[in-house]
């Protein structure tokens, strides 16, 4: 799930933190990819009849098709991926997982009903909601990656947290995931849409945490508190507290402790804190997650030459993939993994830290930009209201 409405808040309050670009802009970089999130996205890439891709024997192959060809596209563009798989979820996440299971069970029933009486759109919608990543999906993807010569890591718990460790240590340029909570785990850079298909034509979004904090004028603790208030995998949001209210509460009070105190002491009782809302434990999971240090032997990864015959045996003989396509893809993989060894020029230079004066100038420019955005928003809203109030047919 990630963090509800966080990207919207960043867009509105720290637009300079987000850079949209093409996949080729990341040539020569190493990237840690949240495997489970990627596999989930491959599984929901269904056919028009609402069914997943399958082999002749009826086995699901969407996850393997996605992992093989999307990884190939990443390597074709000179990027060296390392995939990170989820371990056991933290205990605090069990409530969220139970809710997801219930939603999927309800969706499965609705899917069956839609197949009987619903439209094609309804069948596809409910089919997507029933999808979940199984242990078998993970194991088959690991087998495939090994045959491709692409490294992977098993995280003790959350994959995003382990990706963040690798990014902070400089072992990879960025963490890649659709989950915005990767920023809560202190990943300096988050890439979104990296494993999307080329047909979707979505730009790769590069989000810089330091610019997010600068734009929001918060330290990391306040940022994590904001994310908890917005609603995360560990806790639901406080009822009736939307994104703008959450941002205002953190800005006004500075911490969740103060926010909770203010809500409880409010005579109007505008908001109600849920009875079981362990925000301190949630915060601790973001600040001290169960991860392996970057110098741990399990985090020592390298890229190998693909096992072409192994790929043919697994994908062609066992999963009924096209042999010509698999052999051609393996040849591209072998060639491009070597090409990706080339270093980017930026790797030879260390960034120069900004002076306090430069920081102040940037902050002022950012505040001016925000004011202009607010002013434009007000003017647009006013123009819409005026247009609505005019009788039809008048100019």
UniProtKB/Swiss-Prot annotation:
Residues reported in the UniProt entry to bind DNA: 47, 70, 158, 231, 233
KW Ligase (keyword) present: no
Binding site for Mg(2+) 1: 34, 86, 158, 160
Sequence segments annotated as region (Disordered): 360-395
Chief localisation class: nucleus
InterPro entries: 5-3_exonuclease_C_sf (IPR036279), Flap_endonuc (IPR023426), HhH2 (IPR008918), PIN-like_dom_sf (IPR029060), XPG-I_dom (IPR006086), XPG/Rad2 (IPR006084), XPG_CS (IPR019974), XPG_DNA_repair_N (IPR006085)
Cofactor binding comment, as recorded: Binds 2 magnesium ions per subunit. They probably participate in the reaction catalyzed by the enzyme. May bind an additional third magnesium ion after substrate binding.
Residue numbers spanned by region I-domain: 122-253
Positions in coiled-coil regions: none
Enzyme class per UniProt: hydrolase
A GO BP entry: base-excision repair
Record HAMAP family: Fen
The protein, known as: Flap endonuclease 1
Organism (species): Ajellomyces capsulatus (strain H143)
């Amino acid at each position: 799930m990630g963090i509800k409405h966080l990207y919207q808040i960043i867009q509105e309050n720290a637009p300079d933190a987000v850079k949209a670009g093409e996949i080729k802009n990341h040539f020569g970089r190493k990237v840690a990819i949240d495997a489970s999130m990627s596999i989930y996205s491959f599984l929901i890439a269904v056919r028009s009849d609402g069914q997943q891709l399958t082999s002749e024997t009826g086995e699901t192959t969407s996850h393997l098709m996605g992992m093989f060809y999307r990884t190939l596209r990443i390597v074709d563009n000179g990027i060296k991926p390392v995939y990170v798989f989820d371990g056991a979820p933290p205990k605090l996440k069990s409530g969220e997982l139970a809710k997801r299971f219930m939603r999927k069970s309800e969706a499965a029933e609705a899917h069956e009903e839609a197949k009987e009486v619903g439209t094609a759109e309804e069948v596809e919608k409910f089919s997507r909601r029933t999808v979940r990543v199984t242990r078998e999906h993970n194991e088959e993807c690991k087998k495939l990656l090994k045959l491709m010569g692409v490294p992977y890591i098993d995280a003790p718990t959350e994959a995003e947290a382990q990706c963040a460790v690798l990014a902070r240590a400089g072992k990879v340029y960025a963490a890649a995931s659709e989950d915005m909570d990767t920023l809560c785990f202190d990943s300096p850079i988050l890439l979104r849409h990296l494993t999307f298909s080329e047909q979707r034509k979505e730009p790769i979004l590069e989000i810089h945490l330091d610019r997010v904090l600068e734009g929001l004028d918060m330290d990391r603790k306040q940022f994590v508190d904001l994310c908890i208030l917005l609603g995360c995998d560990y806790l639901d949001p406080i009822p009736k507290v939307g994104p703008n209210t959450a941002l205002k509460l953190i800005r006004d009070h500075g911490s969740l402790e103060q926010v909770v105190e203010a809500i409880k002491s409010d005579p109007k009782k505008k908001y109600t804190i849920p009875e079981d809302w362990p925000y301190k434990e949630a915060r601790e999971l973001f600040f001290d997650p169960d991860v392996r240090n970057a110098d741990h032997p399990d985090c020592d990864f390298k890229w190998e030459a693909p096992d072409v015959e192994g790929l043919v045996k697994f994908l062609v003989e066992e999963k009924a993939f096209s042999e010509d396509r698999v052999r051609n893809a393996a040849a591209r993989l072998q060639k491009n993994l070597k090409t990706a060894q080339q270093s980017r020029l930026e790797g030879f230079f260390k960034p120069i830290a900004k002076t306090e004066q430069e920081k102040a100038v940037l902050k002022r420019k950012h505040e001016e930009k925000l004011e202009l955005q607010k002013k434009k928003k007000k003017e647009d809203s006013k123009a819409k209201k005026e247009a609505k109030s005019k009788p039809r047919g008048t100019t």
